[in-house]
Amino acid sequence: MAQTTGFTVWLTGMSGTGKSTMAAYIAARLRQVDRNVEILDENELEGALWQGMGDSKDERNTLVRRLGFVAGLLTRNNVAVLVPCVSPYKAAREENRRTIGRYIEVYVDCPTEKLIERDSTGRYKKALSGEIPNFIGITEPYEPPASAEVVIHSDQESVEEGAGKIFQSLLDLGYVTSEELKIITGKKMKAQPPTKTPVTRVSSAKPAKAAKTAAKSGKGTKARPAARAARVAKPAKKAAASKRKAR
């Protein structure tokens, strides 16, 4: 019989790290065990939740709170909710944690140099050149979580490996059962005492020069993933001139 415990999995990280891909993968597997699942993707819900809004810090936080409000309603009604959202500011994420309750935070991390390399849209390079203003991680800071339940390094770990971490955390917190996960993964998983491993990142890093250099040379210096998540490039002078969206 399907479990009815609702919960929210909030996937945060810079644009292009793989949050939406991970959310879709998790949702498909939860549906295998008859879970009611909803994905609240900030990009897909643009017209409904933030049409006409700009990219200021307050406006971004308003979007995060709106997604959190909807996620909270669904969670209370026994829905498994997955929210892939850049959500760059820690205070808004923590507010959602408090109000939603049954909540796990997943930090999907990837070095900015890698994001630039694999960005087929060219948005990162445009942001570095000043063509796209208010781009998180380039001209605006991203605040990495200090104690996310799950950290996924998407440049090093596969979707399956990252999903395994999320399923383990859901099991540890009692949001899914070992029987469900045996159907999903084919393995017998055991709950472990939940622990939070702090992510050793600067809590409010500022953009720097590293990614701009990487964009020109195509090479980046080695570093722990997301040590440069927000240490990337100086804000371009053109950035303040427009309010074009860049998610």
Map each language-model feature to its residues:
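Conserved glycine(s) of the Walker
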Residues: 18
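Hydrophobic anchor at the beta1->P-loop junction of P-loop NTPases
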Residues: 11
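ATP-dependent NMP and nucleoside kinases share a basic, alpha-helical "lid"
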Residues: 46-55, 59, 71-128, 134
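Small-molecule kinase domains that catalyze NTP-dependent phosphoryl transfer to phosphate-bearing small molecules
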Residues: 109, 117-165, 172-188
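The conserved Walker
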Residues: 15
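Conserved substrate/cofactor phosphate-moiety recognition/catalytic segment
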Residues: 21-72, 76
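Phosphate-binding P-loop
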Residues: 1-6
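Polybasic, lysine-enriched low-complexity intrinsically disordered terminal tails
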Residues: 179-247
